[in-house]
């Protein structure tokens, strides 16, 4: 074996030094190290496994290749231990080859694992460089300066692998250690000066040591200047240090001497500081002793610092820093209490003043009293202490002379936990209380210390559930280093070292956990990060003293809870869920459900980026069935509404939801199921004991609970500013620092009594403080992310654009800039991956917002000063700013332009929003500053354009562009245009008649309102600068008077009209109420109502009065061969009157030349293109040039005669003989009836009535149909319902897996059905709108389903004017009609489904069958009955309106407000809501009379008789 070993040693000569270094690495906690045999065994085994790599030299690249391959192998069960040993040994060899010195095998494995990702990148880069520069030396990663083959040099950055390796060495051995010096000297051989200094600055280490190193470098530089006077060939200090040089310049050959000098200076500085640190007089070694006073310690420290050969700035830094860090724990705590967050910057004199009493006998007694004080009573000191036994202040419960009292039975002598009469608590009601939900852990009187093995050492750690991290003062360097970590707590910000994968052992439980090494920590703490893994929990004793209020929750009436089966999950997800649920059960947050709790909600899980599983619960169905609670908090608090405070503290409540118990009777509805893989065992069912995540009432219950808990405490502390939103608490005060922190600690103790914990690492003391996305500073506030990302021109997806705009909108309270162009870019395709194109205008708009965000800072509210809100017109938006002092805004905002509102109305809307914001945030009414002049706003208010003004307002010179008031309701000098438009004789027409005699009319499609507006538009186009417009449309009249800005109008016709009007000098608009009795309006009404001869196109000419016809124009040059006929389409469409027809005739000039028009009859209703058929009777070709008159159109009167029957008495030779007189005509209809039945499957009665065949024949057709025989209707449900015209019933039914919403009209039996996605209230309300739009119902009956009885549904029914009633619960007779309809519908649907491809088509066919093809006893279908009822209602309404149409009255007119004599009687020409129109017989004028000056009388008797 010895020979074999020596032979193997010769086989790896290149690894001789590496193996020697590897043998110094310890295998475990003891002194046992790896042997040379272990290394050779590993190398030999690797060569045997990977024969393709056997011949390659053992470089670091080969080792990483082997490492990656080993990771991909899966060893057999019996070889796992050897395989792990092989991996560990290889990791040690790799570390030794890279020059690293891990202490243990475990540390080596951690280092290699950490470098895997970086190594892959390095290999890829290395291959590329080797191809370009084959002359590189072996360890090319240490050469940032690369020699080119073509001459010269180039620079490349320091490799990340090298930088990481240097960081690791500095962290493990120290910044000034020999190991770090040796590594830096090796790698920095060809680094530039700038690279050396930058790498040194970024290394982890003591700040004092870095300051000393910098001082030594400055001394070297001063020495160089003294010894080397300036000259042409002498290097300057800047050249040596690389100041003012680019990387390329510094890499050239002429700078080699400068780089070597800089490298030597750095090495000298490292050695000097290292020797200084080991010298007895080193100030960093001067530390305060426990029995030493602070003054004596400072004297020794200052003496040591003054003796150091360093500059004065470094001495000052050492004095300020070491006077705190090297002080004793007692002095540090005293300085923290007195100096607060500025303790690190305080002078030595201030620290001596703070610690003047530390070490005295009185101070020692005070510390002893604090140490003996029971835990959890920090908030009750001195006279504020209160006995929870008798309720009196001044002593504690254990000191009470009245004896302990039981809080269950009220008797003295025993505690509640020992009470024999105590019974099991029942279900809590509203207002009842219970303790915080916790796991069944052992309860102790004070936080205990337990023995934990950390790495290789046993330590006593304090169990602290308020600490998130596990903190130790020293560590054996086992595990994986993860760099520095910042810890924040009451004492300020502290920096420690983070280590992962550290061996932790508590009793028999062993885990791999994370720790933080903090040498200055006064106590070593076991945090919550490792407590749960080790199975340790802690409950403070005083947490049992107060109970959490319970909020009652329940399901909606008639609901039974969710019963949704758990869907299948993969094995991986089941394992992740099991781990989570087991932990929740152990902590007491979930429990095992009893068998009779049948509700179920599905669960699933997702994997987070950290690799851990997160449990999700699908509470959608439970949320639907649960009654809502009011929101206790309606929005986020805003920092602009906070008052400026001297001290602030931000607290975070840990596990907020999981601390509050769920109302016990409700817990049965929260059950969920853990499946068993492959059904190997029964499923395990759980229920929630606490507020679960994802349940809709968790936020409300939490808010109400915290409100009840904190109400009394807040009232007792009026001197503080208190804010809470969910689990974030804000506390601000102007008290002293110690008093402020005392109140914070008191609050922490107070809510801890209810079981709520405040994690120490999430507590923020002092400014800057981060709260709800804001960053609070002493005099201002801003957003945490205070920059917006840049955007560039080019394509961008809608999803990314929405995220950018969302970031901007969140920050609008500091930006206050509108982005109309970017918002318009978001319109169009709503697909998230659809692309938009960013242009320069969008970039400029975005950059303006980014710049504004950089410049703007928010201020705090001062309750002693008034608040002002200033509004102005921005870029298509209203921008406003809220302030108390000019230039110091509390916040700003933007209200984007609202369509169909004038500028003044938009500013008032924004003022309302501003006022509401100020009242909510500060409780004060602001003084509003409006842009423009005061008289303009008063005029707007008087005209009725705005109906609200702020309580306190004034004006300033703003940028609002007031429109000139050129649209008035008075007569202006100029022509008058009477306009009208609408549906006349079934066609849309519009036009105007001017007082100048000008007339215009045209056919056009559109609604009545659109045609009215189009008539006004045409009049505005043709009218002069000054004109009047008269319309009978109140809608159009009021629109014009509002004088809207055309930029904010949605209606395009209205926008065009306002643009034309604003370009006029002055325009008067007038309204007349009707056409009757007003000559001009009657004239325009008749004018556009006439069916006029209208043409479209240029293929016809106007004719003279004496001409017989209209000439038609040839559209283009036409060639007609001899004897041929050609059809020519001309540019003409014509609309004839009802009593006209037309013919196309030949012109005499063409007939003389042998060219004739053939046919050419145009019917009265024809509206298509006119075509002319031409025949060339010549024996040669004829050419008709373009534009030639070649035919004529002649109008003729239309004569219509009715065709009379033949007549029964007429004598003919045939007489009554022949087929057809036998009476058997119905036989021909049987095939038609069979064909129709095969399509729609009607019943026999419908076939009998529709085709006139005998009833027996129709029944034979139905009986011979196989489909109908297989799908016979079931027996009819019996029951009675309310029936009536326009009264409907509605209900859901299910066909296979599809849901159908069915409506049936109770009078006619008409059915309307739609397939829906689900039985939700939102879906039902959408379908209700469709149903109402088609049938205009009056009343509806439904059952008591959640969708039908929801509050939103009731509000919709009330809005539509539908009387909605519900049937009797659980009584099917109350819904008998719609239930019967369900059976009929599904029976017919089953017959028709095979005939259609889509289910929706089959459903529509079913409605045709039941509504149209199904005939009743009188031969009418449900559709016939429904239409007949609607027509009867219309006729009755019309008859009633005609009876009320003709009215008579007496009236009187007023002069200067005084009523005149009564006149009349006269006929009412038009009546409105508040006035009528009559014609004055004396003056022949039309008068508008208010109803108060009218007395209506019955019509004359002769009219009544008629």
Curated annotation (Swiss-Prot):
Where do the zinc-finger regions (CCHC-type) map? 385-402, 404-421
The record lists the catalysed reaction(s) as: 3'-end directed exonucleolytic cleavage of viral RNA-DNA hybrid; dUTP + H2O = dUMP + diphosphate + H(+); DNA(n) + a 2'-deoxyribonucleoside 5'-triphosphate = DNA(n+1) + diphosphate; Endonucleolytic cleavage to 5'-phosphomonoester
Q: Which GO terms describe its molecular function?
A: aspartic-type endopeptidase activity; DNA binding; DNA-directed DNA polymerase activity; dUTP diphosphatase activity; exoribonuclease H activity; RNA stem-loop binding; RNA-directed DNA polymerase activity; RNA-DNA hybrid ribonuclease activity
Question: Which residues are listed for Zn(2+) binding in this entry?
Answer: 1237, 1241, 1265, 1268
UniProt cofactor note = The RT polymerase active site binds 2 magnesium ions.
Q: According to its UniProt record, which residues of this chain constitute the active site?
A: 464
- Ranges where the Integrase catalytic domain occurs: 1270-1430
Q: Which UniProt keywords apply?
A: Aspartyl protease, Capsid protein, DNA integration, DNA recombination, DNA-binding, Endonuclease, Hydrolase, Magnesium, Metal-binding, Multifunctional enzyme, Nuclease, Nucleotide metabolism, Nucleotidyltransferase, Protease, Repeat, RNA-directed DNA polymerase, Transferase, Viral genome integration, Virion, Virus entry into host cell, Zinc, Zinc-finger
One GO biological process from the UniProt record? symbiont entry into host cell
Residues at which Mg(2+) 2 binds:
980, 1012, 1032, 1085
The record ties this protein, via Pfam families, to:
dUTPase, Gag_p24, Gag_p24_C, Integrase_Zn, RNase_H, rve, RVP, RVT_1
Report the stretches of sequence that form zinc fingers (Integrase-type). Answer: 1228-1269
Q: What is this protein called?
A: Gag-Pol polyprotein
What's the encoding gene here? Answer: pol
